[in-house]
Swiss-Prot record:
Key words, A-Z: Chaperone, Cytoplasm, Ribosome biogenesis, rRNA processing
Function: An accessory protein needed during the final step in the assembly of 30S ribosomal subunit, possibly for assembly of the head region. Essential for efficient processing of 16S rRNA. May be needed both before and after RbfA during the maturation of 16S rRNA. It has affinity for free ribosomal 30S subunits but not for 70S ribosomes.
Protein's name according to its UniProt entry: Ribosome maturation factor RimM
Family the UniProt entry places it in: Belongs to the RimM family.
Entry keyword rRNA processing: yes
InterPro entries in the record: Leu-rich_rpt, PRC_barrel-like_sf, PRC_RimM, RimM, RimM_N, RimM_N_sf, Transl_B-barrel_sf
SUPFAM superfamilies: PRC-barrel domain (SSF50346), Translation proteins (SSF50447)
One term of GO molecular function: ribosome binding
Length: 167
């Protein structure tokens, strides 16, 4: 595991909230309870403890035990909010974190290389894997009829492309 993989991005500090040093954070995790009071997180790779939390739509306002004023809070503006990879929740079999899939090689059933997953779009009906495909992109629906196998150890996603998918 590389140093970058040892830390998982869960948010980004958008700015300061109030004069007491609260931070407005864009939430980038499916587990918003990570921002509950009492939890620890890393901002700029330094550890902080959440003392108070309030929600504002898809953003969270956190107050940190170690930050008591606006000046100290402003220094964290724009910083990444992370957790150690060891703190990741175990997912059910067949369910993956986005960071585990991004960068995987996509091949068809015959072993022909299609590209590499660059992004994952979370849609209401199913996720879509955005893969490089020559000079274009392929939008691969993450459904059982198309995605036949995901093998993290081999770094590979095997698909059975539906007609028109790669045109």
């Amino acid at each position: 595991m590389t140093q970058e993989e040892e830390y998982i991005l869960i948010g980004k500090v958008l700015g300061v909230w109030g004069i007491n040093g609260g931070l407005k954070i864009e939430v980038l995790t499916d587990f918003p309870e990570r921002f509950d009071a009492g939890n620890e997180l890393l901002i700029g790779r330094a550890p902080y403890t959440i003392s108070q939390t309030s929600w504002q739509k898809a953003q969270v306002i956190v107050h940190l035990s170690e930050i008591t004023g606006i000046d100290a809070a402003e220094e964290l503006s724009g910083a990444q909010v992370e957790i150690p990879a060891a703190a990741l929740k175990k997912l059910p079999k067949g369910v993956y974190y986005d960071f585990q899939l991004i960068g995987l090689e996509v091949t068809d059933l015959s072993g022909n290389r299609i590209g590499q997953i660059k992004e994952i779009l979370h849609m209401p009906s199913n996720d879509i894997y955005v893969s490089s495909y020559g000079a274009k992109e392929a939008l691969i629906p993450a459904v059982k009829d198309v995605v036949k196998e995901i093998n993290l150890q081999k770094g590979q996603v095997i698909i059975d492309p539906i007609p028109g998918l790669l045109d």
